[in-house]
Amino acid sequence: MTQNIDTTSQPGDSEQPPQPARAVEPARPTKPQKNLYEPYNTPPVLYHALRAVANLIIAVIIRLRVLGLHNVPTKGAFIIASNHLSWADIPFVPVRLRRKVVYMAKEEYFNSRMAWIVRLLGAFPVKRGEGDRQALRAAEEQLKKGNILVMYPEGTRSRTHTMAKAHSGMGMIALRTGVPVVPVAIWGSEKALKEFRPRVTICYGKPMVFKPVGKKITREDIDQATDQVMRSIAAMLPPEYRGVYAGEVQATGAAPEDPTDSPP
């Protein structure tokens, strides 16, 4: 015979007291992520102090000659477009400018130990090898604010110490914003980290302003603007540095510019 077991709780049976509901902990506030496309706003006092220190160090380690500084606008937004031979180009190219500058720097720098230095210099990232629309918008925004944008259109340092074919981003930004482009030629900087007190020359060319041929900016407009700036840079360089633009300088008959020396 099967015996039925009554499982109903009877009075007096031991019961577990109800557990109080656990209080829900408020979510911890998350630290807002840094917007790397907004350059760090270095305080003016700190920036000019760093600039003074950089000038002092540069005076000790190299013999710097600066040409055509009078070609650089004293106000308003503009682009500095330079050839790129060495890491040293980054502090050398704008070191004699009185105003603060911002840079486009490759994305890898922002994930390295150099990230804090890059941010302090006022740089924002760009993804190389692809059309980084966010970086282009950030560049245009900086120019709309009246800032100076330093660009190295070749995209990286030249391993052969000669000019390589430029990317089109600089030409596109110049056409979209309408700001002047100051071509800059630098040479000798490839020796700055290898020799003691080598001669380094920085030559600032005349500002160039570009407009589209028609109502809309075309690929041809962008390519022509980019090539015109690069030919101007090549024309200021000694022949052995001109690289892929050597033939174009000779073909167009462009004579090397000879800006007068400017005081430091």
Q: What is the predicted function of each stretch?
A:
Residues 59-67, 184-187:
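Short gly/ser/thr-rich secondary-structure transition/capping motifs
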Residues 2-46, 134-264:
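Non-catalytic C-terminal accessory region of glycerolipid acyltransferases
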Residues 63, 77, 199-201:
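A residue-level signal for beta-strand positions that form part of recognition/binding surfaces
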